[in-house]
Amino acid sequence: MPTAEPSNIVLTIGHSTRTLDEFIRLLQAHDVSRVVDVRTVPRSRHNPQFNKTSLPGSLKKVGVGYVHLSGLGGLRHAKSDSLNTGWRNASFRGYADYMQTPDFEQSLEKLIQLANKDRIALMCAEAVPWRCHRSLIADALLVRGIHTEDIMIPTRRQVHTLTAFAKVRGTTITYPAENQRSAQKRLPPSRRQPVEKSDSRKRPLSCV
């Protein structure tokens, strides 16, 4: 018998370079009733079909709601005394630092309230979940008992698992350096963090 789907579930999706029709078909294939946009900058120069000025109207035509939750957006700056030095990528380290703030907690609570009402999909730009800050949001949901899955194709979703080097105390997550080295060895090569070059200003992710 197929495994029953958890009653409390959040889906995630990256719009990437998909056409609007492709994106909508993905949402419909997974019964999404509301998109929660977690981009800090809700527009795309190369894919304007996903701009905040037009996407809500397009989704409304097919019965899908839209909410922009900027309080969960990326582009956060790391602190000089960061507890999250396990992330060598400055963008992820900055977001992990932001996860320790009341603003993040309040926005996450809004997300959970939306998930209690609708079948939601967190949306950002990056197609690959583990290259996007929505994977950290999924960590925060997971430690609160909320099952999260990443939409990959119309017929497949990927269950989110906690970041290997995360340290959890209650609902607080940090990513300390001492946990990172051993965790890296357990990951497949394709998911290991690259060694940063001396100039770390270049942002390798399209996640905003």
Model regions: which residues?
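Residues lining hydrophobic/aromatic ligand-binding pockets adjacent to catalytic sites
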Residues: M1-V208
